[in-house]
UniProtKB/Swiss-Prot annotation:
SUPFAM superfamilies referenced in this protein's UniProt entry, alphabetically: Ribosomal protein L10-like
Name by which UniProt lists this protein: Large ribosomal subunit protein uL10
Pfam families registered for this protein in UniProt: Ribosomal_L10
UniProt key word Nucleotide-binding: no
An MF annotation (GO) of this entry: large ribosomal subunit rRNA binding
Length: 171
């Protein structure tokens, strides 16, 4: 008969896998409790970071319909369940790793696929959703301003512009 404590832990991990938008796995060997707490703060409230046995992680992931690469489940493993921006979590982990040489990003699971440490590092280099949307809005605003200027121009300027474009095409 299964240990009730292990069964409860397994169910909790399974629920976290099912609810998380992505997961990131790390090796925490050599980190103090204070350093782990510092990492949790850096990850923010959208990320649950916890230590678990590799066999429990493997079983919970499988029960949640996720197949993790076996190479991610070696050594002491901590897992970050990301319910917000994976980019922000990856950046926080990468920055934390710069100051704490014992901290190792193993990889994770995102968008239905296992990712390795190099892919997590690449994700950390991306802009987050808010920044990307702001850049897109800025680009669109510039284009819209040009279009508005064109629509507000007198008809003679529009005709000259059309003629210039026609000449350019003919050349």
């Amino acid at each position: 008969m299964a240990n009730p404590k292990n069964t409860a832990s397994l169910e909790e991990l399974k629920a976290r896998f099912e609810q998380a938008q992505s997961t990131l796995l790390t090796e925490y060997r050599g980190l103090s409790v204070a350093e782990t707490t510092e990492l949790r703060r850096a990850l923010g409230s959208d990320v649950t970071y916890s230590v678990a046995k590799n066999t429990m992680i493997k079983l919970a992931a499988r029960e949640a319909g996720i197949e993790l690469d076996e190479s991610l489940l070696t050594g002491p493993t901590a897992i970050a369940f990301v319910n917000g921006e994976a980019v922000d979590a990856a950046k926080a982990m990468k920055d934390f790793g710069k100051d704490h040489k014992n901290f190792v990003i193993k990889g994770g699971y995102m968008d239905g696929a296992t990712i390795d440490a190099a892919q997590v590092e690449a994700i950390a280099e991306l802009d987050n959703r808010e920044t990307t949307l702001a850049k897109l809005a800025g680009a669109m605003q510039g284009s819209l301003a040009k279009a508005a200027g064109l629509f507000n121009a007198p008809a003679s300027q529009v005709a000259r512009l059309a003629a210039a474009l026609q000449e350019k095409k003919e050349q």
